[in-house]
Amino acid sequence: MEDVSDPPFRPLCKVQGCDMMYTEFISSEGLIRDAAKSRQKLDIYEKERPIGIQIFGSEIDSMRKAAEISAASRPDVLDINYGCPVKKVACKGAGAGILQDIPKMVSMTKEIVDAVDLPVTVKTRLGWDDNTKYIVEVAERLQDAGIQAISIHGRTRSQMYKGEADWTLIRAVRENPRMAIPVFGNGDVDTPEKALAYRNEYGVDGIMIGRGSIGNPWIFDQIKHYFATGEHLPQPTVADRVEAARQHLDHSLEWKGLRLGVVEMRRHYANYFRGLSHFKEHRLRLVTEDDPTVLHLSLIHISEPTRPY
């Protein structure tokens, strides 16, 4: 997820039980042009493994070159994003946009598989719209092109994130007797109960969680504990949320520098304190303050209201 699954956030998910993580998706053209922001997204760390680098683009040659550049960072997996529905990506033929040209999608995948000595995986959607839900055939063809796993979001590109994710076609992919690679489901899993129900009902090999982890890195341990015991872990306390936000801020400052670290962290605070009635009195300071020391004190004040600034 762009601006989410970066090095400042990933350690929080790893500590909370995430089994496999991916970088933010990285533009193939940005990598080829050696754009600083794209290159920085290649940063991965030993403590994060296993981890995949995810790339996107619309041109086969550029994607092959980007795959070779990415492979030099030695991720455990190289992932191709054929699922991003955002207009500026999809309408240029990248991300979910390539679902309008399946032969090109297959050719691009084969080029990337042949270009690197890493397992290649794919993240995609059911189709471009309700009339092109060809995911069962597409998954089979991508497997034949050499991918080692596929993650499927249960919506079309046209749906964006509206309505409910439809996992029935994900199950159809899993039940296809020709499919020999792992099939992971994605979409709307934000509780342990949903994770267990979807795994059992749709027979997937695993579950990919995206939006459900934003401001909630605890979801991974919560789900795994529920799978193992049928019981819920305690919900994170206010102090837990403050500590997670503090660590996220510190990691952001370390990786992005003072200015960007402060500014780009602002989008995350509300997610950590969602549902907390007294958060609104702290929000303005968190999204306007530039001094990390004051930000740290502001976070502490959320769990210790009587502590002076």
Go through each PLM region and give its residues.
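Glycine-rich, positively charged N-terminal anion/phosphate-binding segment
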Residues: 3-76
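Conserved, mostly hydrophobic/aromatic
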Residues: 13, 24, 53, 80, ...
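Hydrophobic faces of well-ordered beta-strands that scaffold small-molecule active sites
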Residues: 21-23, 51-55, 78, 120-124, ...
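Glycine-rich phosphate-binding active-site loops on the catalytic face of alpha/beta enzymes
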Residues: 24-27, 82-84, 154-156, 202-221
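Catalytic cores of alpha/beta
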Residues: 61-72, 132-140, 189-209, 216-218
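Alpha/beta enzyme core
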Residues: 64-78, 82-94, 103-181
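C-terminal helical cap(s) of enzyme catalytic domains, especially alpha/beta-barrels
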Residues: 162, 216-232
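Single conserved hydrophobic/aromatic residue that forms the stacking wall/gate
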Residues: 300-309
